[in-house]
A protein has these predicted regions:
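Feature 14080 marks short, conserved micro-sites in well-ordered regions
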Residues: 1-172
Length: 172
């Protein structure tokens, strides 16, 4: 029997609910759910609990378990992680840490569960996989994360101090 998972509320609380082919409804994760995205066999999302605030979580519908990926910004505020993007065996996403108001590019290795800051302070948005690398927008320029060298560099569309202000990336 298969199941359909999604964020919903029955009036008493929201979370990830599953319903099987017989119509059996179960609350699998109780809490806020934002940015639900399928990554491999799991659903990744920005979830919350009273202790950690909004942090990256994952849910596996096969064994019906949910877990917090990491407490990136300790305390009840949270890292506001999002834009989860799979590249090879790594999930990349944007999240803030103790640097006030600054978002960084993070990488999470699915096989080792190692989490690292892949690009410091770049304010990444619109993470897009292109030819085995990660392209993303920053407030000033496009940036590329090279998975071979584990380094990032600007793609300088508009040379000079003004930048190009990229947005609405689309893979063709």
């Amino acid at each position: 029997a298969g199941s359909d998972n999604g964020d919903a509320s029955n009036g008493a609380g929201s979370g990830i609910w599953s319903v099987d082919v017989n119509g059996t409804l179960d609350l699998e994760y109780s809490g806020s759910v934002f940015g639900l995205k399928a990554i491999g066999d799991d659903l990744w999302f920005l979830g919350s609990d009273p202790t950690h605030g909004l942090e990256p979580w994952a849910y596996n519908p096969g064994n019906m378990t949910a877990w917090m990926i990491a407490d990136i910004l300790p305390g009840s505020g949270g890292s506001f992680a999002g834009d989860f993007t799979l590249l090879g065996g790594t999930v990349f996403f944007a999240a803030r840490d103790t640097s006030p108001g600054v978002y960084h590019l993070w990488g999470y290795d699915l096989s080792t569960t190692n989490l690292w800051k892949a690009d410091q302070g770049s304010q990444p948005t619109e993470l897009t996989v292109v030819n085995g690398h990660l392209l993303f927008a920053t407030p000033n320029e496009l940036r590329m994360f090279n998975t071979t060298s584990n380094s990032s560099y600007d793609i300088d569309i508009n040379p000079g101090i003004l930048g190009s202000s990229p947005s609405s990336l689309a893979l063709m």
